[in-house]
Amino acid sequence: MLHFPVLLEESVDFLINDLDGHYVDCTFGRGVHSKLILEKISSKGYLSSFDKDPEAYEFGLNFKNDNFKIRHDSFKNLDKYFKDNSINGIIYDLGTCSTHLDNAKRGFSFNKEGQLDMRFDNTVGEPFSEWLEKAKKEEIIEILYKYGDEKHARLIADAIIEMQKSSPIRTTIQLASLIKDVY
C-alpha cells in the first residue's frame, strides 16, 4: 500500500516559493512529496531527497530526473551537503509510513508476525527486541510516553519487565498481545 501524506498539495504549494529554487525532501519514503515537487518546479529547479531507509533509497534511485538526487543518509547531516542559504525550502514528513507497517519483516507492524526490529535502517543499531532486553523500566516508560504518547506507559513497562523475566519479547505480535492485555 502506498503512503499518502496528509495535506500533500497544500504542503508542497506552501513549500515552493521559487520555481527555480532548490528544495529538500528530508524524508523521501516512497517519494510522494518528491514526485509532486518535481512536477511543480521548473527545469531550473532542483530537488535533493534524503532517507536512511535502504528500501526507500533504492526506490528513489528509480526516479529518473536530472533535477533530482537522493542520498542514503539522515537529514541530520544536511549541512554536510549544502552551503548556508543554498536551499529555498525543506519538507519533513516524520514518523512511520504504511510501507513500514505493511511489511512484517520491518518489525513495526502490530498486525503481522515479524521480528521486533523497528529500525528505519536495519543496518545500523540494534533491533528493538535487543534494546528491550537490556532497557530499564524508566527508559521504557520514557520511550513509550515521549515517542508513543502512551498514557499507559508505566503499566506497559511493568508488563514488559515482568514478561522479560520468563522469556524475551522477540516478535511484533508478542509485544502487541502484551499491550492489548494491559488495556
Regions found by a protein language model. Give the residues of each.
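S-adenosyl-L-methionine-dependent methyltransferase catalytic core, i.e., the SAM/SAH-binding region
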Residues: M1-Y183
